[in-house]
């Protein structure tokens, strides 16, 4: 399998820590994404490493028994360590605060602490087998204050730090889940819900395992992911992942079912809003995108893998230290190892090898694995880093080797412009709201974020259409059809078409002498009026004489003042066109000779300069009976230049009758 075929990879720079062994225990904190390596209960050192930490945190603590759980509060201000089932110990890591440990026992009598979660830099939740206790930690007083508690029988729990939701498993079958949400000193109880267990014979006792539940945010919404090893319907083989949507308000609802079509050991990650399911037996993974169209049965949507199953890209463990200098080759990493542990959303840890990786999606290989261009675009436009790949797909579908049909090209352009229009509308609404003084509204207005899915006209023009038009091998009819298809799509979404796209169409038509088509496009307003377009038409007069009149008509429709038209033409170095225009409206006796001679000089075309100079000499002769310029016209430098280039004898002599 070529390297271009893998669409999942482990990050290049993993967090490296001391491998787990009888002396060294390894813990992972899902909130701070930190790995703790605790040697000899902390007596010979604790090393804490996170993905963004340039400098690991190292410290020692007294060995007061086996460490069951160890985590820093957010911002690494307070360390919490659980050594017994009854209490949690705390130690301040704040400058000028006492570093003496202080302890908090759980309030409920006879309860055992299953674990704890920090929800902020000074708020912590104890989860016991009899409920939860929410505390505020006061580091300066070295004590805790109980904010709220709730009694409920708990089998196990899981925590989603991104949304600050704790899920408690209750009842004998362990499948009734009770969520709690934490925010700024408050604890809210959300409606409990039941996870449907697979159908099973009466003799077997099925219960919900903590291993088969994950919580993750997908497309901004919180979901509970349940790995159901056997489908509820007996005629269906293989496992499935059931997604329950957990809203901030209202009941949890089953929304999606991801069909795995295989059985065995699975693990789940969420990367870039994609659900990744790893299968240990085949050492492959598949990805699901719940935004892509699935099969809806009236209640839930069924999804199949977006792509064929593939292994994560082979990974070599980089050598460090003196060994890296020798000829020793890097060691291939054992992928899908039984020692791998996955954490949400995108973390894979190998405790036996001492590595923490972030899982990543590679978009470029997917282009060749998903032949349906419409579905490919739907998929790519939802990804964070999609712009370069989206533009490469557009270029590829216009290339000779992979040329797509016009309906497919139209579909792709429509999908791009749908996202583009969504952003333009949101941005306009925001601007109008700010201008109307609603910027201090509650909740405060947020400027829409321009994601990489917003591919605008300049992106398509620069990266796709310009190179495409320059390819001389392309049939010109196809080129024009593609350009018009993009303009059609922009018009359909009511996006004003930029003049440079119209210019590209006109230049292509002129290049292939398709003047009749150009005339039709202008006549039926397929190409929108604009000043740059009118100037371009004027410059085409020598190839296509009617272009002059078409241009003037356009400028008049735009209500452009005559002197402004002249300025526009001169700025575009269309000196002759400007002169023809001014003669056409009878204003040539009053124009500034110097302005036209300046413009002619700037073109570096001496014959053009000669023509313009001669025109004004003739005008002077006609109006004043003398070809020479008057001092008031300030043309001395141009007369000197004319003499220098053409000689004094080339100047007109006054005509006498």
Curated annotation (Swiss-Prot):
Compartment(s) where it occurs, according to its Swiss-Prot or TrEMBL record: Lysosome membrane; Late endosome membrane
Record domain Mic1: where: 471-637
Main location: membrane
Any one GO biological process: regulation of autophagy
One GO term describing the cellular component: late endosome membrane
Tissues/organs with expression: Highly expressed in heart, brain, spleen, lung, liver, skeletal muscle, kidney and testis.
Keyword Membrane: yes
Keywords tagged on the record: Autophagy, Endosome, Lysosome, Membrane
Domain of life: Eukaryota
SUPFAM superfamilies on file: WD40 repeat-like
One Pfam family named in its UniProt record: RMC1_C
Coiled-coil residue windows: none
Record function comment: Component of the CCZ1-MON1 RAB7A guanine exchange factor (GEF). Acts as a positive regulator of CCZ1-MON1A/B function necessary for endosomal/autophagic flux and efficient RAB7A localization.
Sequence similarity: Belongs to the RMC1 family.
Name of the protein in question: Regulator of MON1-CCZ1 complex
Organism in which the protein naturally occurs: Mus musculus
